[in-house]
Amino acid sequence: MAAFPAYLALLSYLVPGALSHPEAKTLTSRASTEAYSPPYYPAPNGGWISEWASAYEKAHRVVSNMTLAEKVNLTSGTGIYMGPCAGQTGSVPRFGIPNLCLHDSPLGVRNSDHNTAFPAGITVGATFDKDLMYERGVGLGEEARGKGINVLLGPSVGPIGRKPRGGRNWEGFGADPSLQAFGGSLTIKGMQSTGAIASLKHLIGNEQEQHRMSSVITQGYSSNIDDRTLHELYLWPFAESVRAGAGSVMIAYNDVNRSACSQNSKLINGILKDELGFQGFVVTDWLAHIGGVSSALAGLDMSMPGDGAIPLLGTSYWSWELSRSVLNGSVPVERLNDMVTRIVATWYKMGQDKDYPLPNFSSNTEDETGPLYPGALFSPSGIVNQYVNVQGNHNVTARAIARDAITLLKNNENVLPLKRNDTLKIFGTDAGTNSDGINSCTDKGCNKGVLTMGWGSGTSRLPYLITPQEAIANISSNAEFHITDTFPLGVTAGPDDIAIVFINSDSGENYITVDGNPGDRTLAGLHAWHNGDNLVKAAAEKFSNVVVVVHTVGPILMEEWIDLDSVKAVLVAHLPGQEAGWSLTDILFGDYSPSGHLPYTIPHSESDYPESVGLIAQPFGQIQDDYTEGLYIDYRHFLKANITPRYPFGHGLSYTTFNFTEPNLSIIKALDTAYPAARPPKGSTPTYPTAKPDASEVAWPKNFNRIWRYLYPYLDNPEGAAANSSKTYPYPDGYTTEPKPAPRAGGAEGGNPALWDVTFSVQVKVTNTGSRDGRAVAQLYVELPSSLGLDTPSRQLRQFEKTKILAAGESEVLTLDVTRKDLSVWDVVVQDWKAPVNGEGVKIWVGESVADLRVGCVVGEGCSTL
């Protein structure tokens, strides 16, 4: 999330995190009453990884000469609505560092103009196409750079989709850690290739929208996650994305194991910065900052948007309060220096010191001129929107993603593709436009017309929208449209007529409630919105041939109509963005064969899921959200519980057929030890003088013109703050300035580099055995042996590759690599990744879904077709 309406922001409230629990060595599995996040201090310094050495050297030279005010300026936001972006830091003009602009969203520039509204993350995941994941990242980065955004707030790999009703699952790439990992890491590589900084989010456990934030009434919920589940499931995509070089990580609102993420020292210091070797800076989600000294010591580097518990009052936990904390000694100057060095090093690492644009847009108004600081009572005005067009040819990428994500679930009697002269009757408002205007609802906070994205801060304005109605009318010579959610009277149906029924299911962020759903799908559940099920059934009674097109944020129930004889075909078009119409007609009329695959499971009933993944209501006191299902979410649960879903994870049909033959398993690097080779030692980190700065460095400059509510680093009485340094600060239990031994699972960005040694490689020949062109996806799942002594899911997606467009009879050999980490479990005692020696007992499966396996391999025995 980033900025949201002021009246909702006022609900934010300071609640101290729980930091005084009995000592524990690991995050073992516990009941909620025992959930505990152990202390991990001090915060590790950045700069010890060679890939970042040059950037840190440049940062060190600059930070060494900064004043206290200049340092604090870069760590703190200037206040909500106090600039053009969702958030901005202060600046250091003396060294050419501007106010850094942090802005949404993961699918395009939010609240701007002349930008691309790309398909959502869940749509990208459904492509199973690594090239498109990267290309979208490049497009996002180019548009962020073009608008002068230093830090684009995305991608999102958390939530992962633990809760099917969760409001923001659609911002990520699917309900699997590996799919999320590829989506996140490739997006980051693409974005940062342009010089824009990616902010990976939300770390961690923000799997439900309701009750995530602390308020005047209660504390945000605690996601209670055991150590193994944390590493193997929720942390997995973060580790891969850190390995990709993420410049920033955004901390979530909620608690993890009863410690607020923004001041959870185990999570930030211990796991993210030490074990995963993260070299960039850690930033809060908007208004997730709930403590000053505690968060600094826990490893937080930047506060956004800078305000305190109640925004718009000009208060802050940092800004001048951080200046005070450094002067009185409660925050060590070493910690501040590392905070600033991480920020400046990231700025240098992405080359933003070289002709990077300043913001040329305003997220606060569409007018050309307006207040420069809208959150101030009195603000100077000027040009705030220059209407810079940053779209380039990104519409091509957007259309390709939306098209290649479309997932064909059912196609009885090959009713699809359609012919241009077929008699078509189209039903449902989801086929049309929002009659109030395509951008009439703030942050897409309504469900009117075709569903292009969910709602909330993860959205973008549509530069244009080609609806399915417009696209079909442009192609079909005989189409009749009924843009209504009630089946109309008097509709005639010929024996060969085809009805196309459009339905959808929406969700979003919890600061907006749409049709009774406060972010999460509380009221609608997993059912279609706007009478969708009844509309399909009514069409099925009238027509012999019905095609259902679904735009949805995630799993949707189909049981009321899926088995009706006249429902011949079902397409899931996910959330297609601006190219909703053209991408759909590309598939409907057969210009392309569908090649999308489900990035989640579609159940028969919500009761098919474990009870623990349901939405949780607000009791008196803090909600304890216990992850008692452990590793078993989505398809992993269905397999373990022996429940056959309506459609399995990875399912997707084509207009053609494919054969998988000639499988081969190669040993690339022997797994001759259970644990990876010893980690590389840490390199040196920048050092600075440890003396406290002079109090005069944060005195108000003479004749300074203050902007009301703008957050500054200056103190009215800095000498008084320094005089209080003799007082003893009540540090959290376990706080120390003595560095901890380097964790054995670390050693580089993402962890021990030996974890990414390719151990096995599977080659398989994919042949188009049908009569139409098409693309196939080979999905690789691993099954780990019981000899590891742990219960593991019977199938875990670890790799996938997609063929080029294959003509009828054409073949392509795909290579799918398997790493040491892919075959490892997290050892909570040793605190390292453990694999079966020599891969003994490992089974590898390749197929077109988790339930449609075409190749089976056993390490040491070879492969066979199934």
Curated annotation (Swiss-Prot):
PROSITE patterns: GLYCOSYL_HYDROL_F3
Protein EC: 3.2.1.21
Gene Ontology cellular component list: extracellular region
InterPro entries in UniProt: Cellulose_deg_GH3, Fn3-like, Glyco_hydro_3_AS, Glyco_hydro_3_C, Glyco_hydro_3_C_sf, Glyco_hydro_3_N, Glyco_hydro_3_N_sf, Glycoside_hydrolase_SF
Top-tier EC class: hydrolase
Family of the protein in this entry: Belongs to the glycosyl hydrolase 3 family.
Protein name as it appears in the record: Probable beta-glucosidase F
Species, as recorded: Aspergillus oryzae (strain ATCC 42149 / RIB 40)
